[in-house]
A protein has these predicted regions:
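Acidic/histidine-rich, surface-exposed loop or edge segments in extracytoplasmic proteins
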Residues: 12-17, 29-41, 79-83, 177-181, ...
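Extracytoplasmic/secreted envelope proteins and their assembly/folding machinery
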Residues: 26-33, 47-59, 74, 81, ...
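Bacterial N-terminal signal peptides
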Residues: 1-7
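Conserved functional hotspot residues or short segments at active or partner-binding sites
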Residues: 117, 166-177, 514-674
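Cleft-lining beta-strand/loop regions that shape enzyme active-site pockets
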Residues: 11-13, 20-21, 37-47, 184-191, ...
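Polar, glycine-rich mid-to-C-terminal structural blocks
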Residues: 457, 469, 474-540
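Extended, small/polar residue-biased N-terminal targeting/export presequences
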Residues: 46-52, 59-132, 183-238, 299-301, ...
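PDZ/PDZ-like domain segments forming the peptide/carboxylate-binding groove
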Residues: 44, 60-61, 82, 96, ...
């Protein structure tokens, strides 16, 4: 049995202020090691090989950009590279705390340097550059070499503020406050922080969805799981000196604004319509979250650096009204779009599904008609058919998943029965999950739109529609999250729990497989018609995670494909799509934006010369303004040619193209039937 005994106590710091592990941490670490050994899906031995991975993860999590440690520090840490497996098994956390305490000294030294030089008068006429991404660089061999890295860091930050319109005194004020706050945050580090970073360096060696949460962070995790927070509905994560948005809650203010995307970085926060914008670069993510949260109905303004943009690039400001994230906000919604082409008129129904949810309380009270994604979509289909739509599109973009049972039952609205998904657990046992719905709710033309942030339950639904050839799947390759997690409180594994609270462990226990036997893990769902994408598989999604569980295949479940889609139809749709990619201005603009973002992401070095940076900034603005004018004039021309303007009024190029493809699909289907 996985049960441990022991009293939980201990001090966080010794008399010199050095951080030390508590007895609770020693107990927790032994429990975590045993849970991963007994229950995790991946059969991985805690050995020298994994020890090296944990070592690299820990160093990277502390100083991934190589701004603090010296090369001599790393050499001194190497003695632990192949020892962490043994120390973890014994509940020994000395190596982690030794490394972290050295890190604290180096960090404090760098912050002292930054504060001493934040008022320097930099020469912006020099032709020198700054490498902001130092992941591939070596560690500095001396303090003088690290000083030069930080001189350029400060110069780049000052230049960015100058280019945004800040006066010299304001630049100094912002930088000074930034690093004073950073130093204040560092002083708040405690042994729980060290332990959480170290345990997640261990869990990340198993897979990216296995995580440890301290008791404090466990409370936040549970609140987010219940969607009970009053705020903007965004999940935040530390990303070096920045706080990154990693998830948007369906129906939350951030999601509904359509101005914020995953991977955006929060660099400033202001309260109310006229509150001062506070610089939050260098803040801890929990402090950023605390600043964003507030009473329902109040306004918060965020200054964001778009995901993929280089430091110093143009930022955007978004105003949001805080609200409580309620179940109703995750409900599917529908609209009817009129589209005309070549003398043919099409009435298209669009159903947006932001989340797969089920209201358990309502289910207990109303077992025949409870609130759920499936029941909502079923009602929307009935309403759309009452409006005589020619086809229906299911929009699953940015739908990160939810209740598995809802993905299965919603598939049943379009499929006549059979297996929807297979699940394989850590013991190798496979369970098939079938659609139990009697009959189908919709038999007409169907397409499903996905993107890189469609994950988990979304991938199950899209994969089933594609495998059964029930509809056409369009958009981008999905995230590739095909695993199942369990969440357990570590206190559950103690024979005699003490009074002190322990954290939570979320760990992977199973994998999803499509009816064909192909896993959705790692590869996700590849659409039948693939759109140009901002997000590359190498940088975003499951395939970008080094420890992600691999794709594999099991035996296919018995199933009979339908005849709604065939290769001839897909060839026609692909041809029409390719033609529009070359002619449609919105799609041309989209491809231009993608190319520019790709160029920005590949850029690891920026100029520290004012004139050159100003020219680059002005060139980007000129191109952006020119495209806005072209787009406005084209919209006016199109409005004169087409009687129904509803499609032309749409700003969403992906949605417009999906509607056009569904119209092509409807036309191709008519020709097939003769």
């Amino acid at each position: 049995m996985l049960l441990l005994t022991g009293t939980l106590f201990g001090a966080e710091r010794d008399t010199t202020g050095i951080l030390q592990p508590t007895e609770a941490h020693l107990t927790e670490s032994r429990i975590i090691v045993q849970i991963l050994d007994y229950f995790h899906y991946r059969e991985t031995d805690l050995n020298d090989s994994l020890s090296s991975v944990i070592f690299n993860n820990f160093i990277r999590s502390l100083d991934g950009n190589k701004n603090y440690f010296l090369a001599s520090d790393i050499r001194s840490f190497e003695k632990y590279r192949y020892e962490l497996d043994n120390t973890l098994k014994n509940g020994d956390l000395v190596p982690a705390f030794y490394i972290f305490n050295i890190y604290m000294k180096r960090l404090e030294s760098r912050l002292d340097y930054a504060l001493a030089h934040s008022g320097d008068k930099f020469d912006y006429t020099k032709k020198e550059t700054f490498r902001f991404d130092r992941d591939k660089a070596g560690y500095a061999s001396s303090v003088a070499e690290l000083d030069e890295v930080w001189r350029k860091t400060l110069k780049n930050q000052a230049l960015s503020l100058k280019l945004s319109g800040s006066e010299p005194d304001k630049v100094v004020e912002v930088l000074t406050k930034r690093y004073e706050r950073f130093k204040s945050n560092v002083a708040k580090y405690n042994s729980n922080d060290v332990f959480e970073i170290y345990m997640n360096s261990l869990t990340e060696g198993f897979d990216p969805h296995t995580n440890y949460f301290t008791p404090l962070n466990a409370e936040d995790f549970e609140m987010q799981s219940k969607k009970s927070l009053e705020g903007i509905g965004a999940t935040l994560q530390q990303d070096g000196d920045f706080t990154k948005i990693t998830d948007l809650r369906a129906g939350g203010p951030a999601f509904l604004s359509q101005q914020i995307t995953k991977e955006d970085r929060v660099i400033g926060i202001a309260q109310g319509s006229d509150g001062e914008m506070i610089d939050v670069v260098g803040w801890r993510s929990d402090e950023v979250a605390g600043e964003i949260r507030g009473p329902k109905g109040t306004l918060v303004r965020l200054k964001l650096l778009p995901g993929g943009a280089t430091p110093g690039s143009e930022t955007k400001e978004v105003s949001l009204v805080r609200d409580k994230i309620k179940l109703d906000d995750a409900k599917p919604k529908s609209e009817v779009v009129q589209y005309s082409e070549n003398g043919s008129d099409y009435t298209i129904g669009v159903i947006t599904v932001p989340d797969f949810y089920i209201d358990g309380d309502d289910m207990a009270k109303n077992p025949d008609n409870y609130a759920s994604t499936t029941n909502d979509v079923k009602a929307l289909i009935k309403d759309l058919e009452g409006q005589n739509v020619d086809g229906i599109m299911i929009d699953l973009r940015n739908n990160g998943g939810g209740a598995l049972v809802e993905a299965i039952s919603m598939s049943g609205l379009f499929l006549p029965g059979g297996t929807v998904v297979q699940v394989k657990d850590s013991r190798g046992q496979i369970q098939k999950y079938d659609d139990d719905n009697k009959g189908v709710s919709y038999e007409g033309p169907l397409n499903v739109m996905i993107n890189r942030f469609s994950a988990s339950a979304s991938e199950i639904f899209a994969g089933a529609i594609q495998d059964y050839k029930r509809g056409v799947v369009v958009g981008e390759q999905t995230y590739g999250k095909g695993t199942v997690q369990n969440v357990r409180g570590l206190k559950d594994f103690l024979r005699q729990p003490g009074e002190e609270e322990l954290g939570l462990l979320k760990f992977t226990i199973a994998k999803f497989y499509r009816v064909t036997g192909s896993s959705t893990q790692h590869r996700g769902v590849t659409p039948d018609i693939e759109y140009p994408s901002v997000y590359s598989a190498a940088e975003f999604g499951e395939s970008s995670k080094p420890s992600a569980l691999p794709w594999d295949k099991i035996a296919a479940a018995p199933f009979k494909p339908m005849d709604y889609v065939d290769n001839d139809m897909l060839s026609i749709l692909k041809k029409r799509h390719d033609e529009r990619l070359k002619k449609d201005q919105a799609l041309l603009d989209l491809q231009y934006d993608i190319a520019e973002l790709a160029k920005n992401r590949s850029q690891k070095v920026v100029s520290l010369n004012y004139n050159q940076r100003k020219k680059e900034q002005d060139d980007r603005k000129e191109k952006r303004d020119a495209r806005v004018k072209i787009g406005a004039s084209l919209s006016e021309l199109e409005a004169n040619k087409v009687q129904d303007r509803s499609l032309n009024d749409m700003k969403d190029a992906y949605l417009k193209e999906s509607i056009k493809l569904l119209a092509d699909q409807i036309q191709a289907g008519k020709k097939r039937r003769g």
